[in-house]
Amino acid sequence: MIDQEYILLIMNCKKYEKKSLFQKMTWLKKIPSYLKYYHVIGDTAMETEYEFDNENNVLKVRVADDYNSLPKKVIASYIAVNNTFNYKYIFKTDDDQILVNNQYFDLLCNLIKVKEPKTHYGGFIVDVKQPYMSEYHRIHPELPKQLPLYITKYCSGRFYFLSSEAVQYLILKRANIEREFLEDYAIGFNLSRTLKESILLISTNKYFTDIELSDFPKLVEEGKI
């Protein structure tokens, strides 16, 4: 096992490789040295369940590389980290996010270290007070139109973190998570109440912005990335 206290997993896919390249060109160059990151992509043709490419900061997992398989990709990547590293926390974000505050991870890690009781989960909290049908298929037409969300609290997929204890609990819920379509909801819904008692609220919109609001579209159009 490799000692690595903090690991950042960025959900990516081959189709959007340019987004990962732009992230590497910009904010990922400035993250703290104590933070190891991987872009996570799926590949059903793999012979093994997962493979770390440390030279290119890529984690490949044996799942489909499409949007509907995102819950499968996420839990597979957590299993890969759990089997490979001695870690304290996993941070998760997406390939369409840009970090706009270079002090973010220092601030967050310092806060996590001193928080009592220990926090196992954090991010921008979505509080589902009544069951409802998701309208997310209007943004991602590949999603089912009948997609119920039940009463729970979960952290938005833009960015959230999980302790090693939370990850190990979620691994036991892998089958349940893989049946879902919305990754962030699947994680929060399947995490135990005990591990959600001290969720750390983070105003992630103050620290992250969408990649489409950056120079990324212009650089793609100009063929510079």
Positions of PLM-derived features:
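Loop/turn elements at helix/coil->beta-strand transitions in domains of secreted/extracellular proteins
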Residues: 3-6, 32-36, 86-88, 116-121, ...
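Conserved, well-structured core segments
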Residues: 8-10, 37-39, 153-161
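Short coil/turn segments at secondary-structure boundaries
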Residues: 20-24, 51-54, 72-75, 103-106, ...
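Active-site-proximal specificity loops/subdomain of glycosyltransferases
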Residues: 39-88, 102
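Conserved catalytic core of nucleotide-sugar-dependent glycosyltransferases
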Residues: 71, 93, 97-189, 193-194, ...
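PAPS-dependent sulfotransferase catalytic core
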Residues: 195-225
